Structure formats: C-alpha cells, structure tokens
Amino acid sequence: MDATPMQDAPPADYYSDGSDGLVYGTDENGNKIHHIETVIRNNATREQLLADPLFVANDTTYVVYSNYRRMYGQQPQDANERITINGNMTMDFGPLRLKLGTQAYDYEGNSYSWSRVYGGTDGSFVNEADFTMGYLNARYTISPLSYVKASLSQQTYETTSGNENYLNDIEAYGRRTKTWGSPNYYKRDRTGFNPVAPDEFFGVAGYGSQYTSFDTRKTTTNTISFDYTNQIGYNELKLGASIDNHEITRYGLGASGVARAIAQVDTDLDGLASEQEIIDYAGVDGAKDWRFINYRSLYVTNLGYNIYGDEWSGQYNQDDHMLAPAEPTQSRFYIQDKLEFKDVVVQLGVSYETIDTGAMAPDSDNDGYGDSDGFNNLYFNRQRVNRNGDGNGNYVWKKVKKETATHPRIGVSFPVSDRTVFRANYGTHWQSVPMSYLYLSDSQLSADILAGNATASENPALKPERSTQYEIGIEQRIGAFASLKVEGFYKESKDYLTLANRTEAFTNTGGADTQQNWAQYQNGDVMVSQGLTTNFEMRRTRGLYAQANYTYSEARGTGSYGSQNFYITWIGTDDGYPKAMNLLDYDQTHTANIILDWRSPDATGALANTGFNAVMSFGSGTRYTPSQIYSTVFENRWEFPEGPVNSGTMPAYSNLDLRVDRAISLGGLTANAYISVFNALDSEQVNDVYHGTGNVAEDGWVATESGQQWLANRLSQNPDVDAAAMYQDNLAFPGRWNRPRTVRVGLNISF
C-alpha cells in the first residue's frame, strides 16, 4: 500500500493505466486493482475549507491502494504473548502439612480482523490482561481415621482492551492529528466498508479506520474453605464450609465519541472543550449537563467508576452516576455421611448455600429490599436515574434480598454380582447467573430507556438458576484392569435467563409519569435434558491407559440463551415469546471421545522417558432454525423462519489431536521436548452455517431470481470480473471455521 500524499490531484474517476509510477496488483484476468479515498489535508473541516479563499484541489490528499492481492499464510495483527510463572512449596511438620503456591501471567494480544487487513490495521484491537493467584493449603491429621483440611486463596484478574495506539487515553480515540505518519493522520469518523476497486463490490474497512471501543475490568476473589473427615464405624462423616467474596469493577464506552463531542464545541482547535466554549455552544443551562449527556449517549457501563471513568470515591453520586464496585459473596455449609454396610452403600448429604450479590434495585413494595418489579417505576430528574428517589420515600433503590437454599443429595449403590455394581443418585443444585447480567449502571439504564434504541438491560434482582438431577446406572468390571459404566440421567432446570419487554413501565419526573417500553433480562426460561452415557476405562497396563465414552442426549427448553428473544422485544410487544419446549441450540444428539495415553515403562533404552497421547472427539451437529434465503451481504434484516425452531442440524464435528513427548536432561535441568498436532486429519470443523441453506459458506441468494438478475447486471458491466466468486468472498470469511491442522514444536524446562 502506498499512502503518500500525491502532489497533483487526479480527477474523481481516476483509473490507473500503469503510467502513474505506482505498482498495482492484478486479478486473475489481468485487471489492475486499486482503491482511492480522499482525506482533507491537515484534517481541516468543510467549513474551514469553504472560508479559505486560498483553497484549491491540491488541499485534498488522495490515498491510493496498490499491490492488492490474495495472500495466504500467517494472519496479520494476530500475534499474542503470554508470560506465565508458577511456583509452590510444601512443608511437612509431622501431622501438619502446608503447601504454599502462586501463579501469575501477563498477556498481550491482537485479534485478526479480515475486514481490516487492507487498510485498517494501524488502529486494531489489542487486549492486555494480568492474573495473579496465591494460596495456602493445610492438612492436619488428627488420627488414622480423621483429618482436617483448610485453604486460603486470593486471585486477581484484570483485563483492558481497546485501540492499540492509545488504549487508556480515551480522548485520543476520535481525535484527528496533523502530524504526518501518526496513526490518526488519516482518522476516519466512520469505519464502514468501502469498495476495494471500481470493478469490485466487496468492502473492507477504509484506510485510517480505527478500533473505537474501550473496556477495562478487574475482579478480585478471596476464598476460605474448611473440611473435616472422620471414619466412625460404618460411617464416613464429612462436613465443611466455604466462603467466596469478590470485588468487581468495570468501565467501558464507545471511546471515539468523546473526541467527537469535544470537536463540536472546540472553536480554538486546541483539542479541549473549555467551559466558555461549551456555554457558547449549548447555552448556560445546557452547559451544566453537556458533558454528562454526551457520555451517556456512548452507552457507558461503569461499576466502581463514574460515567467519566473516575474511580470509586466512596459515595454514590447521581450527578455523575458514581457507583460502588460490586461485592458479591457466596457461602456454603455442608454435611455428608457415607454409610458402608456389607451389601449396600448409602450417601446422604445436605448443603445450605447463600448468594448475596449486594446489587441494588428499586424497592416496589417498601419491604426494605430491591426487587425486579421495582423497575416498572423509576424516578428520573435531569435526564438521570436517581437512586435516592423523589425525596418522599418513593422509588428508592435498596439492596436485593440474599438468596438462600437447602440442597439435599442422596446416593445408593449395591453389588448385583461380584463384578457388577448398581448406582443411583438424586440431588438439587443452583448457580448464580453470570455476574455480567446482574450489575446495571445508571448511565446505561438511562440510555437504554431514553435513547429509544433496541437494547437489553441487566437486572440486579435476578434469581439463581435452579436444577434437579436424577442418575441411575451400573458399573461392570471387565477382567483385572478395565471397567464399563452405563448411566442414564434426567435434569430439570428453571429460572434460566430470558429477555422480555416491560410494557407497563413508567418513569417519573417531578411527579409526572411517562410510560416506557424497554427490554430487561428476567428469570423465566425452563430446560430439560436427558440421555444415556457409557464410559469404558482401562487402567494403565504396560504403559498404556485407555478411555472411551459415548453420550446420547436431548436438550429441550423455552430458550437457549438469555438474549434469544431480542428480535421479539425489538418489535415492542408482549407477544411471541416461546412457550413450547423446543430443541435448544446446543442440543447435540451424539458425542464420543477416545483417549489413548502411552508412557514408556522402560527406565533405559531408546524409548525411555517417551510418551504418546491421542485424543479423538466426535459430535453430531448442534441445532439451528431453518430460515428464508436472503442476501446476507446486501440485506440488513431479520431472519424469517422456514421451519420449526431448531429443526435444522449443523454438520457433524470430528477431531484428532496427537502429541509425542520425551523427557531429557539439560545440565541438571529437566526438560520435556514435544510435538503436538491439533486436528491431525485436517477435518473441516464448522462454527456456523447460513440458516437459509445449512451451508457454512453459501447463503443461497445468488441462485435466486433476484440474485441471478444482480449477477447478470454485474457481468454486463464488467464481463471479465467473476462477480459470483467475489460475492462468495463475503460469505466464506475465516471465522466460520475452526482451526485447520496445526503443528507445534516446543520445549518445557523445569527448574
């Protein structure tokens, strides 16, 4: 690519005849491929150009793309680096054993974007992440039949992603610069696609386009656990407790909008928005909330920050939506008894568990706790959510109630013969919904309701997802070294996430109600899964360990994931939500795995310290809903179903991974040399299909009447250009497949 400013401006319909001195790539028919864009010199505004009597055509820079060609090999902007440190130390004090350990890593990586490789790679995505963990495990032996275990741990994970050139400098994301060679010299306000050449139609991100979003998150988790075990006659008694406490912060926004807002008022072009410039632009009254309103429109998510990215000050503030970090706590206490009689083993257990998210929600019934119904009536002033309410005790936000549950577990096993054992288990379980669905920032809620766009808001009052599971099966010993297990299972789950409109919601401002209609995550979906699983296992014999398993299953429910109803809520009604139990997106009828691991039993010889591992996996296709054929390139619209929900099946999946390794000694250090081959058979592994055809790389539109008409028009205009093939290029982008055969050669060194 040659992006040097040309001295003479060519005409708008400029097409190279090869005499301009630039080198152009050619397509398979010999046609030159190029792309021209215009960028105003020194990034002057249109108004400045019109007011400049000396403005001439040469004040426009023409960015000329040359050497466009198909390339294969390593993907640009797809590198990553990770440095990991592990360490542990064990101390033995007789009955007391202690183990100290730590792990840490530092990561930085880019993400390949097929649409940016022609001109937008200078402003690509980058992610930086850090993880640290430390733990102390202790075990104290009380007697030969009893012991106590305790554990303390802390881990912190922090990740930041954004534009690789600026990352944390949010105002720089959208700011044009005048320094030649700087990343934002050719900054584009819009990053939409542009034709690569006049005789082609598929688009790429134009030169100067920048990654425009910023996001940073940090989670610190402290865990303490205690377990006691004692064998008393026929009883193996266990009891214990654990507490997990988290602190979660996050901040994210469409960062390029900050500089764009400043540019609206920046009359002296110093890159700043002074108080006087804001007053001149918005008036005295408008200036008071100018900054807030501009940030709110960027759909800021803030937790432990205010809307501007300032860290938690210790006090909630409605003016700038300062919010405290999230501090959820989960605790569990359990007691279990395993009764071992001559002909039967019975396991009885019960756990008492709590989930306290610490999240805030409006209190609709004045019982002192926030609840989901409270979101039907919210108090606003100055276009802001006000968690303090109207000053008369109404619309006040309070902490949601702590969730508690008692979960029984029962297991029974007894021998049918000297080689066969029957087993049956029953238990109830729960899990908190993902934290990302629980914590709602005021700025995002304000934008979701007032901006009028189709959105999906988090819900601090979501309840945990609950399930009840039954298992029954047998285990058969085969010879002296192998066993076969056959087990049937049935699982019912409820309170899964769903998305629904609040059609009877109101916002109150100064005593006046305004009806709103907005979508929020709620509990509601149900799921049932059932199936049969078999597992064959052979203990290591002459160095060989083998395992094979197969599962037949079916998963049905009213929704596969929380946002599945997004298009229904977009319509704005309260009708059309799924009520029937359909096959779920992740329903997979057949899955199977085979593991072979051989470790040389010889201490000396050619194969000493050598190992071989093979893992083969197979899965029948997951589900999708067949839909009408349309152009996924030209038409930006919803899919219209052509069959029952999830009645289509994606292609089956198969994979074979191989690894050979050998331990060697290097000057007193222990090293392990290895060769790993992933997807050794180079099987096609499909991530998604076009729902009109069930094909990974073909949406079926070119074969339709409208597609054929388009193709005829293209061929009449450019008979030497294979329009059908170029349309296909827009469909068959790399992310639709999993990785091809990949070989890694490495060396692990331990010291």
Regions found by a protein language model. Give the residues of each.
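Short loop/turn motifs that connect adjacent beta-strands in outer-membrane beta-barrel proteins
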Residues: 92-95, 143-147, 231-236, 419, ...
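Transmembrane beta-barrel strands of outer-membrane/channel proteins
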Residues: 1-3, 100-104, 150-154, 239-245, ...
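Transmembrane beta-barrel wall of Gram-negative outer-membrane proteins
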Residues: 1-108, 126-148, 351, 408
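Signature of Gram-negative outer-membrane beta-barrel scaffolds
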Residues: 72, 76, 211, 238-417, ...
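Gram-negative outer-membrane beta-barrel transporters
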Residues: 489-492, 497-623, 748
